[in-house]
Amino acid sequence: MAAAPWYIRQRDTDLLGKFKFIQNQEDGRLREATNGTVNSRWSLGVSIEPRNDARNRYVNIMPYERNRVHLKTLSGNDYINASYVKVNVPGQSIEPGYYIATQGPTRKTWDQFWQMCYHNCPLDNIVIVMVTPLVEYNREKCYQYWPRGGVDDTVRIASKWESPGGANDMTQFPSDLKIEFVNVHKVKDYYTVTDIKLTPTDPLVGPVKTVHHFYFDLWKDMNKPEEVVPIMELCAHSHSLNSRGNPIIVHCSAGVGRTGTFIALDHLMHDTLDFKNITERSRHSDRATEEYTRDLIEQIVLQLRSQRMKMVQTKDQFLFIYHAAKYLNSLSVNQ
């Protein structure tokens, strides 16, 4: 059995120093983004235009202009608070991980969220991973945007015409979109999977697509690394249903904290040499004989932060990734 990767043996005090470095880097980017620097890589672009206020759940979480998701529209505003994210660590990533990180839909934006899912995922079998409860501490964290199969909750229609911000904020999509409940099942006590059909009301727009909606609302205690076990199962399950070529859509409330933490863990466990060996004992094991000299988790978080602000937002979330990775390694050792 190979030794545990060196970077999961670091002291918390050292890890907090790394988190501070990551945060300081981002502070510099945001200063540049807001000081009028021409052609800044960190420009927030149209996200801060007043007409988009109603499209942002929070006033301080915006996508960078260069990798924001553009809605597929026939006319009008193409803005949604969502970012394309690619994770690819040289020397470790078996293949790149592709995601859309986005805020939890609101009562004004749930229609455009579904239009994004349909048009920005080119293939059938779309996966959405939701890592927030609808309500937390008596505060709405996400609007219940999907049909759950109850009485009068099997079909919804996302309109082709939307104006979340009023008359000056119009968007025209190619078609209305029918969102239809198919079935639901709970996986152990871990998460709930709802299968949904997306059907354009104009058949010329495109085919029916299937969405697999993973609702993981129990992730509350970042001090318990064993909570990575259901996440590990969720990662494997969601990848098995997602069509290769589609990004996995991940959201919490703001689309940065738990979203970033999930994406970091997902790529770590599913697509890196060090941890693919632990979680699957895969055929790639002979490729990881040399110890990786960089801190793999830090490299992943740095990549996430360079593509969407505040990804892995808190110190507890940052530490959780390391503690969870260490816990996974201990499971492998004890097998």
From Swiss-Prot:
Molecular function as annotated in GO: protein tyrosine phosphatase activity
Keywords, alphabetical: Cytoplasm, Hydrolase, Phosphoprotein, Protein phosphatase
Record Pfam families: Y_phosphatase
Highest taxon listed in the record's lineage: Eukaryota
Which Enzyme Commission number(s) are on file for it? Answer: 3.1.3.48
Ranges for domain Tyrosine-protein phosphatase come to 15-328
* First-tier enzyme category under EC: hydrolase
Q: Which family does it belong to?
A: Belongs to the protein-tyrosine phosphatase family. Non-receptor class subfamily.
Quote the protein name from its UniProt record.
Answer: Tyrosine-protein phosphatase 1
The organism named in the record is Saccharomyces cerevisiae (strain ATCC 204508 / S288c) (Baker's yeast)
Source taxonomy: Eukaryota, Fungi, Dikarya, Ascomycota, Saccharomycotina
Q: Which gene encodes it?
A: PTP1
